[in-house]
Amino acid sequence: MIIDAHMHYFKIEGFDELAKLAEHENSRWGWQEICEANQIVFSVAMGNSYDAPCRFGGVTPRLINLGGEPFCAQPYNQSDNVGYCLGVQSEEITPDNAEKTAMEFEYYLQRDSHCLGIKFYMGYQNVYLYDPRHEPLFELAKAYDVPVAMHSGETANHHGRLRYSHPLTVDEAACRHPDVRFVICHAGNPWIVDAFEVASKNENVFMDFSGLWEHRLTPEREEEIEDFQKYVRMWMNYHGIWDKIMYGSDWPLINIPDNIRNLGRIVPEKHWNEFYYDNALRVYSRIKVCVAEVFRDS
């Protein structure tokens, strides 16, 4: 069984096009077919949509909407086997609205077991993860025992500022907040060595291996990435933090069978259970309740 610890569940034309390049369909049913064909029992979607109503005068979280527009928490109108992280618009948070923003986020954490964590889009948002404006959200993550995930590494467009997305910035936040779990998304690629060091040093830091390649992988492309895979596996073996690495796809960016197969070439088979399932269940701890409900209803 597999838990996809990093994907997207967002209806937008750009994602529709990405799905086509990966030979998939960016739709609720398209994702369900993928899950059934590849033993994916649950998925963690990163919040992208901007349809959250403002209730407390703060900056609203980005949600998911591929399962139904607009998003609804009660009753939950997305797929039961898809949970989500609340996306943060860091540049809009100010000292005046930071506490009210936390109230906007807490609304979902209080009411929806599918709300699994908080996602920061560093690099796309020109703010460091450890900026004081984020403190109320870190306190919220601690109170509700949910992880903080951070976009790390390269950005999908040239507008991104890479200094904000470097995995070393997670070290600063993790040291200041030892009671909060942090996830370095995309393994910090291309700064994978740095990401491994941050996760190895800090007990509260984990990594997801999503978005390392894109589209459908041709035989020629798979041959081209062999050296990269060996490089990642070398550092994975060196650090041996098998309880800190999680499978992710960044769907609809990548063809799912291609992704599962190629990540399986990096992670030794004896650690597949941890990588593909166990670690995500522990890091995103609310998944346990959701998975139990999925199996009960199936």
Residue spans of the language-model regions?
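Active-site environment of divalent metal-dependent phosphoester hydrolases
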Residues: 10-13, 50-53, 91-94, 125, ...
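Divalent metal-dependent hydrolysis catalytic cores, especially in the metallo-beta-lactamase
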Residues: 17-22, 29-58, 81-89, 116-117, ...
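Active-site gating/metal-coordination segments in enzymes
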Residues: 52-164
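Catalytic pocket-lining loop regions of alpha/beta-barrel enzymes
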Residues: 115-117, 130-246
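N-terminal cationic-hydrophobic initiation segments that often serve targeting/anchoring roles
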Residues: 35, 73-77, 109-110, 174-175, ...
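Mid-to-C-terminal alpha-helical segments outside catalytic/metal-binding sites
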Residues: 1-42, 233-234, 238-246, 252-298
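Alpha-helical scaffolding within the catalytic cores
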Residues: 25-32, 63-73, 99-105, 166-170, ...
